């Protein structure tokens, strides 16, 4: 699509329509999310400005559109090809999870400990083509968890922390513009709303362990609910224990919930017999316990 055609399509998007008529495709869907606001502003200028100003706005629009699409095309080509461990319970429902993420803006994933949701969900998002127009943001409640998850996901994607998988915690940022996944604490993402109120750096956000309900998580969930109508291209995945699934679904206006069982291992209990150093069978209670 040429720059002038994109301007014309943007102009038609502003025309009022009935609630049942289909919405046109976003003319900037293949551009970086961080560039879309600027592109829309330039498109308006190219329509309304007179004479030389209009020509300059059109030239700036065309240049930015070409640059942004080029970056997205390169990011899409460089997306990792994830491999999935079929023994993880979450991968048994990978197709269902991917379908829900593709169809809905918000998805609630309930998974018990050991289900693999923390490491596999960002890979499922990559498989869907997410991460091309912005980072796949992935929050953890604690700094240690963010670093360990980043290391594990990078290992599974055969890349390095600080390259394909970035991590950002307090006083420590190993993220580059070419990173696809960005691990961080929920406090870091909340702080970024001050400088990036529309979270344009991201095309997908995963809020992990949301059932912990810290202040940061609660603020983020409230903020995202207000943001989603303004960012229809943004996908949000919330993971939680089963106890809070319906509450999260109601918060996001009936978002679909999918449950994933945990992975259990057999536990064998053995009792070590009391052993004595001599043949004296009489021992006091304290020695027997110790």
Task: For each feature predicted by the language model, list its residue ranges.
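P-loop NTPase motor module signature
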Residues: 11-290
């Amino acid at each position: 699509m040429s720059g002038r055609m994109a301007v014309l399509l943007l102009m038609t998007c502003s025309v009022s329509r009935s609630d049942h008529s289909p919405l046109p495709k976003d003319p900037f869907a293949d551009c970086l999310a961080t560039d879309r606001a600027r592109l829309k502003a330039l498109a308006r200028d190219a329509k309304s400005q007179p004479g030389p100003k209009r020509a300059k706005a059109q030239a700036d629009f065309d240049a930015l559109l070409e640059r942004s699409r080029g970056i997205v095309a390169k990011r899409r080509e460089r997306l990792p090809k994830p491999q999935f461990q079929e023994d993880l319970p979450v991968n048994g429902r990978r197709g269902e999870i991917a379908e829900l993420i593709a169809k809905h803006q918000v998805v609630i994933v309930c998974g018990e400990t050991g289900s693999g949701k923390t490491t596999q969900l960002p890979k499922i998002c990559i498989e869907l083509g997410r991460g091309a127009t912005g980072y796949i943001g992935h929050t953890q409640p604690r700094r240690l968890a963010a670093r360990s998850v980043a290391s594990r996901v990078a290992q599974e994607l055969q890349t390095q922390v600080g390259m394909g998988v970035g991590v950002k915690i307090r006083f420590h940022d190993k993220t580059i513009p070419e990173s696809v996944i960005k691990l961080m604490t929920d406090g870091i993402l909340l702080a970024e709303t001050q400088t990036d109120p529309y979270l344009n750096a991201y095309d997908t956000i995963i809020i992990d362990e949301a059932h912990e309900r810290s202040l940061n998580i609660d603020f983020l969930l409230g903020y995202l609910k207000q943001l989603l109508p303004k960012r229809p291209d943004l996908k949000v995945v919330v993971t939680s224990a089963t106890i809070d699934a319906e509450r999260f679904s109601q918060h996001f206006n009936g978002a679909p919930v999918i449950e994933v069982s945990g992975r259990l291992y057999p536990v064998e209990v053995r009792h070590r017999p009391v052993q004595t150093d001599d043949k004296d069978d009489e021992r006091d209670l304290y020695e027997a316990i110790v």
